[in-house]
């Protein structure tokens, strides 16, 4: 009943769907640290705001689980306050961008109630289903272009590492347009082609722009392979990172983005910038972009 109520209300509140997934945000940038203030990029912060700020993604995870309080104090696992349900409910709102969710308190509150219920849900670094979106500038055949890299955390021996999962690059997408089904059906090799020593195979190469129409219906272009190929050939040259954000699917029936907010406020740093109720059965197709 509680989950049905959340689903019904969140459908009314959220308004949009998943179109904001690839919207870019500011890159995390640290400055110097004076005694009573710190410069975060171009923003001077007072000491109180600096402590309240969620400065690292690891800190976001600890605060989300209430393994660290809003003042930056880590909580001992043996302490009764560790992952305390009530304290977690009271403090979790600091992890939302309140300039956005201050105007949508219902959705924020339903999320907090859901993740702090008796079957509480926590984030874990090695729990899978959370990804980093790194927007970067490259030179492609001498011209500056934007490219998005999707990274995930992978276990490595006793530790872990970030690995490239997927690439979004408009130039690659142009190579494999979706195409009209009727048009695709015009491009095929006759089932008796083998009896003619595949003399008609030239058809595949006559129109190279649609050569993939002759592949199996299960064919999916691998953009990560194209990415590595272009790098190895020297056609694609890295310049710099422009922005970073995170996409979190770990929480049952929810998706949220975590973006960097650079401002002199206690509500700053890594914060939830987009929250959507998504039943688990609907996540499967979305996750194909993050783990093809």
Positions of predicted regions on the chain:
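Bacterial Sec-dependent N-terminal signal peptides
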Residues: 1-51
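Intrinsically disordered, low-complexity segments enriched in polar/charged residues with Gly/Pro
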Residues: 14, 123-124, 136-139, 233-235, ...
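Core segments of small alpha/beta cavity-forming domains
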Residues: 39-107, 175, 182-231
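Long, acidic/polar, low-complexity amphipathic helices and coiled-coil-like
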Residues: 45-66, 125-178
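Short N-terminal edge-element motif at the start of the domain
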Residues: 74-159
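Short, exposed beta-strand/loop patches in secreted or surface proteins that constitute
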Residues: 123-125, 237-239, 261
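Short beta-strand edge/turn micro-motifs at domain boundaries
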Residues: 144-203, 209, 242-292
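Long terminal regulatory regions of eukaryotic proteins
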Residues: 225-241, 245-250
